[in-house]
Amino acid sequence: MVVRDNQIAAERISPRPRRRRLLKSPRLRIHRDKHGRTLEIAAALRAATLITPYPNCVTSPDVSSSFPELHNTIVVAAFEGWNDAGDAASDALEHLDAIWEADPIVEIDDEAYYDYQVNRPVIRQVDGVTRELVWPSMRISYCRPPGADRDIVLMHGVEPNMRWRTFCAELLAVADKLNVDTVVILGALLADTPHTRPVPVSGAAYSPESAERFGLQETRYEGPTGIAGVFQDACVASGIPAVTFWAAVPHYVSQPPSPKATVALLRRVEEVLDIEVPLADLPAQAEEWELAVTEMTTDDDEIAEYVQSLEQRGDAEVDMTEVLGKIDGDALAAEFERYLRRRRPGFGR
């Protein structure tokens, strides 16, 4: 009996055997945990059906013939959750999907990425009779907008709870099959910005030249990041240019929707794609949203005073930017040289 108990105990504490068969990929690195067990990577888990297709769509990202043939492709991506204040970014992706009638390609909904106690599946009524269970996922679709000379891939889904590097590798594997050469990531954050002014849009670019092209100021932020920042880093590391746009949503009205921020992000998409993005009734929704928030804030003297202080601070920053923008750099340098000459010993004697 003692021997049997000891055998059971030994089996319980014995380390699991290591995986020995791994698919190699020049793009992916293999990570191991502290016990030496190999962590899952996208290339090693293809056979585990990490990607679940839409009906009548692609069955495996490894089968090139099952993907649509796209060229000069650009990705527009957004992630729900921490990266999506007021649902501004995800609403922008849903708008693009609707107006351009995007065709679905694949859906990544593997439970290796999601904690269902944090991001729970949702039950929806269908025709008032049957019910549909919707799992947290990442949906990937494509389209060719009218007047565009390139294909657009839309990536929209829920920020994963775990295995972010594997998740990004999965998205990059799909991007590689679709001949993606540029990635645009949309996000939204809560900020000290008034709802009565244009929505500030900041961002992160892959090079100083791209930052200048898209009018992005150099960011000095250091701190936690979400899957949007991780995915951008993964894209750049794999050789795909990627830029992220962040719309600032007033923190005192953080509940979705935030149509004004959504419009601001779509304007940025227009700049990158160099085509007009139909906004439908979004501008009208943005006006109604601003009026409703104004009415709400004016009912509370303390909040109204706070909003006014944000307006004054923002206007002062804009005025200073305009002043600095009018300064002639060459004239300023010449004046500085004259100042230095005046400071030299013996000047004017």
What are these regions (language model features)?
Residues 9-10, 38, 42-52:
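Ala/Thr-enriched low-complexity intrinsically disordered regions
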Residues 3-5, 31-32:
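Intrinsic low-complexity, disordered N-terminal segments enriched in polar/charged/small residues
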Residues 253-349:
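A conserved C-terminal secondary-structure "cap"
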Residues 192-272, 276:
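Catalytic cores of processing enzymes, dominated by hydrolases/peptidases
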Residues 79-83, 154-164, 214-222, 252-256:
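Flexible, glycine/proline-enriched loop segments at strand-loop-helix junctions
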Residues 11, 19-36:
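Polybasic, low-complexity intrinsically disordered segments
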Residues 150, 157-208, 231:
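Internal, conserved structured core segments that host functional sites
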Residues 53-157:
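N-terminal short beta-loop-beta anion/metal-coordinating cradle
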